[in-house]
């Protein structure tokens, strides 16, 4: 059955550059909103509760990324078959994938919440979290992990909407929740400490998720379900898991390297932790364009592979890489001029060591933003093409890079070595991803040609 595409966005026809920019810009704004209220959390903690509290929240960043990133990867992976069925015009299979994906995501989020809430304090101790910030770190991350089902709700619904070409609606709902998050931060941080900022985050994201769900149910007329769509079918479950689990593992394996690196940073003391936290928040904000381009290419590649248009996939990679490279040069110039002033958002001017170290990390990382562009664009493209296992291997490359720095360089070169950990990880990932993409493209072209000859 052909899909009526007027309610959604078809990325298989038209100028790739215009389509990528048109799709990525709303997605970018949504990510900026998300990072903005994450930054506001950190700014409020640093200014209202002090450098120790800032370090406490920051020390949870890598384990947060590992667990929450795994959940986000699962959700994004579940949306790839939806994009492919949309590109192929198969409405029945599309609805089956959405229904089965929703059931799996619900079961997964509940299980994950129970497990990580039980073990999160032990994990923080294993990571050698400094004793003077351990209680604050636990108070923050426990609440964040309690909110995993709400986070999965938002990411699952927004990923489905993006797979159908709508990157604007999730942005609107995220903007609303961002404002609410800031208000709740200001209300809850003084009486509840760092836990208050965590409650503000999960409440805001939960509201955003429910808004996405209600809107999707009302506006996406192609999503008309039957009871069969909600029953788990072996074929759809296997395909969803083949996409979702590798994509989740990609985030988690990458994050394992970050956890190992964070453990090394923790060994340098709470001042180093605070420096990495401030620089990390700024860097995450600056990296949103790369994430937006990557997520765009996952949907773009998924739809065009479904439509058997490999030339458009290659053109999309080139366009996204050029866009990301131009941005890399611009943001490096901005941070060279004003990185110290921006760091003052997180700590007082008297914290000169933290300010100097944050600037050092920002500048070293941003010199290598062009390799980071390729990591995001090529990895998400490969995922959208259906080769999620290659994304796992790219994550392994990043994990190895960060682990080598943590184990062998940080003990000798201290904080400076920490600053080079991510660039090493990005370069190793690129050395694997570029040949992997060429292999995937060649494989699909051969498959499409073979199928065409048999018809």
List PLM regions with ranges:
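Short alpha-helical transmembrane segments in multi-pass integral membrane proteins
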Residues: 1-24, 82-147, 183, 189-245, ...
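Residue-level signal for short hydrophobic patches within transmembrane helices
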Residues: 13, 17-36, 40, 63, ...
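Transmembrane helical elements of multi-pass membrane transporters/channels
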Residues: 22-41, 143, 154, 177, ...
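Residue-level hotspots within the lipid-embedded alpha helices of multi-pass solute transporters
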Residues: 31-35, 69, 109, 113, ...
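Helix-terminus/linker motif at the lipid-water interface of multi-pass membrane proteins
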Residues: 32, 36-55, 124-131, 187-192, ...
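Alpha-helical transmembrane segments of multipass membrane proteins
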Residues: 39-42, 114, 156-160, 182-187, ...
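Small-residue-rich hydrophobic transmembrane alpha-helices
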Residues: 54-114, 151-170, 275-339, 372-386, ...
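Short runs within selected transmembrane alpha-helices of multi-pass transporters and secretion channels
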Residues: 75, 143-162, 170-181, 197-212, ...
């Amino acid at each position: 059955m052909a899909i009526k595409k007027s309610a959604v966005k078809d990325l298989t026809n038209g100028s790739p550059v215009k389509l990528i920019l048109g799709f990525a810009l709303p997605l970018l704004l949504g990510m900026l909103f998300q990072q903005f209220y994450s930054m506001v959390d950190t700014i409020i903690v640093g200014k209202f509760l002090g450098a120790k509290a800032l370090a406490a929240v920051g020390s949870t960043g890598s384990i947060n990324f590992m667990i929450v990133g795994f959940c986000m990867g699962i959700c994004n992976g579940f949306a790839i078959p939806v994009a492919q069925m949309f590109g192929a015009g198969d409405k029945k299979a599309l609805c089956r994938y959405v229904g089965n994906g929703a059931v799996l995501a619900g079961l997964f989020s509940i299980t994950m919440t129970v497990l990580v809430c039980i073990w999160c304090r032990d994990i923080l101790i294993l990571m050698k979290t400094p004793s003077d910030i351990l209680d604050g770190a636990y108070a923050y991350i426990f609440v964040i992990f309690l909110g995993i089902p709400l986070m999965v709700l938002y990411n699952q619904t927004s990923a489905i909407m993006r797979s159908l070409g709508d990157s604007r609606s999730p942005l609107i709902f995220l903007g609303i929740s961002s404002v609410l998050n800031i208000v709740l931060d200001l209300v809850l941080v003084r009486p509840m400490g760092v836990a208050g900022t965590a409650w503000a985050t999960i409440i805001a994201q939960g509201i955003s998720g429910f808004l996405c769900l209600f809107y999707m149910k009302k506006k996406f007329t192609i999503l008309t379900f039957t009871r069969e769509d909600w029953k788990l079918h072996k074929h759809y479950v296997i395909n969803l898991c083949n996409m979702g689990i590798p994509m989740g593992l990609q985030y988690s394996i990458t994050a394992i390297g970050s956890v190992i690196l964070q453990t090394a940073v923790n060994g340098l003391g709470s001042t180093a932790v605070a420096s990495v936290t401030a620089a990390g928040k700024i860097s995450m904000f600056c990296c949103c364009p790369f994430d937006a381009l990557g997520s765009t290419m996952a949907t773009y590649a998924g739809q065009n592979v479904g439509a058997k248009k490999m030339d458009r996939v290659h053109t999309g990679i080139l366009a996204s890489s050029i866009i990301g490279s131009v941005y890399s040069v611009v943001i490096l110039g901005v941070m060279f001029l004003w990185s110290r002033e921006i760091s003052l958002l997180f700590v007082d001017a008297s914290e000169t060591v933290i300010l100097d170290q944050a600037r050092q990390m920002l500048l070293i990382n941003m010199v290598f933003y062009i390799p980071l562009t390729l990591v995001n664009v090529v990895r998400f493209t490969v995922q959208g093409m259906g080769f999620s296992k290659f994304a796992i291997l790219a994550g392994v490359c990043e994990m190895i890079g960060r682990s080598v720095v943590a184990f062998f360089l940080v003990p000798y070169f201290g904080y400076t070595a920490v600053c080079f950990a991510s660039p090493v990880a990005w370069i190793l990932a690129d050395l694997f991803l570029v040949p992997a993409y060429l292999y995937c493209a060649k494989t699909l072209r051969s498959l499409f040609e073979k199928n065409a000859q048999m018809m």
